[in-house]
Regions:
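Conserved N-proximal alpha/beta basic substrate-recognition cap immediately N-terminal to
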Residues: 8-142, 151-153, 315
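Active-site nucleotide/adenylate-binding loops and adjacent lid/helix of ATP-dependent enzymes
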Residues: 92-224
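Short, flexible loop/turn elements at secondary-structure junctions
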Residues: 113, 149-151, 165, 207-210, ...
Length: 382
């Protein structure tokens, strides 16, 4: 009962903010929410407010009709990506082996913990045991370093390591904290979160990457700020449909948006030019479009992601490499050495914060042609 009361309070709060932002009365908002049921995307109350569907001036394309409700976010990708084809999007070692062997620019791996008797040289130094990992981490020459599980979601188990303190046998984290070698190495064999992290798949260490100078001048922080590019991958080739820049804010060592809970930022990216706009820090209506970085104060106007044409070229090359996955969610690091692929994702859900929905007319037709209609009958109603 208390949860229901809190939910109603939140809806009332959203209604009030939407009215302040647009002048729309609660009655008008309710009518628009009810009308969403006929649009095929299964949007509901939270979608209406979180994606700013209450503000006609903010919306692009066909407006509310183009939006996909949260109930279908996962189903959207499941309908297009057969489960038999998505292992490279879940296992970072599998992806690195396939993409690296094909010549795609993947972030290089320095070392990999894995209990297998032998692994590919592409995965760097083979760390077969916890003792091997601990010995590796006690070498001061390897830092700075970034570590992450081979199988994990939302960056659980990852860490940005800046050095080794032999006085307390600890690694030094990018935020200034410390963790003993013993405690850190436990994540090699123990899950940090059983929902997202599968330690049996291994753990990789990568040399820390340098953020592209133009982007570091904006963030004034060392953490990599990745760009997510969503692409449809059909017989006629790859079609990028949305892109967004994920901005890590100090002291965070990763750029995950996490619905705004971590304090990071996310911004729209123009697919043709790579120009960045409409930067926010939360879901609507509890956010605003920032004209400058809220921490550094650097203006956003005119900022373009470097090497944007190369990013799109890599997306096209990757489409041919993973043809059975009909939707790709690519994550790139934009570094001082150029764009590097961080990972390919199977499922994504942060692409509709900037006024444009995923369910455009072209995307609907693509779904009808390539989705598994037997397992996903909702596609037929589009």
């Amino acid at each position: 009962m208390s949860q229901r009361v809190e939910q109603l309070k939140e809806f009332h709060h959203w209604t009030k903010l939407a009215q302040e932002q647009t002048g729309k009365s609660p009655v008008t908002q309710l009518k628009e929410i009810l009308a969403l049921r006929k649009m095929g995307g299964q949007c509901g109350i939270s979608d209406y407010y979180n994606y700013k569907l209450y503000d006609d001036s903010y919306l692009k394309g066909r407006g509310r009709e183009d939006f996909l409700g949260w109930k279908l976010h996962t189903q959207f990708s499941l309908a297009l990506n057969p489960r038999s084809a998505v292992l490279p999007a879940w296992d970072k070692n599998v992806f690195t082996l396939i993409a690296g062997s094909a010549g795609l620019p993947v972030a290089p791996v320095m070392a990999c913990f894995h209990p297998a008797a032998q692994i590919s040289p592409i995965l760097g130094q083979h760390l077969r045991s916890i003792e091997d990992v601990q010995k590796f981490l006690r070498n001061p020459d390897i830092y700075p370093l970034f570590g992450k599980p081979v199988y994990s979601q939302q960056s659980y188990g990852s860490a940005s390591l800046t050095g080794y303190d032999d006085q307390c046998d600890s690694i030094v984290l990018v935020n200034g904290g410390k963790e003993t070698i013993f405690e850190f190495s436990r994540r090699m064999v123990e899950s940090v979160d059983t929902r997202y992290h599968k330690p049996e798949c291994g753990y990789i260490f990568q040399k820390s990457l340098d953020l592209a100078p133009s982007l570091q001048a904006f963030t004034k922080w060392s953490a990599i700020c990745g760009v997510r590019v969503v692409c449809l991958n059909g017989p006629q080739g790859v079609v990028p449909i949305q892109a967004m820049w994920k901005v890590a804010v100090a002291p965070n060592h990763v750029d995950n948006f996490s619905s705004g809970r971590r304090g990071n930022l996310i911004a729209n990216v123009d697919l043709k030019t790579g120009e960045v706009s409409r930067m926010v820090d939360k879901y609507w209506p509890d956010t605003q479009v920032f004209e400058s970085h809220p921490v550094t104060g650097v203006p956003l106007a005119g900022l373009r992601l470097p090497d944007w044409e190369r990013v799109l070229e890599i997306c096209h090359l990757g489409g041919a490499l993973f043809p059975l996955m009909k939707i790709h969610h690519w994550d790139f690091a934009l570094t001082a050495q150029g764009p590097l692929i961080l990972e390919l994702n199977d499922i994504g859900g942060i692409a509709q914060l900037f006024g444009g929905g995923l369910l455009t007319e072209n995307t609907r037709e693509f779904l009808k042609c390539h989705a598994n209609l037997q397992e996903h009958p909702w596609v037929k109603a589009l």
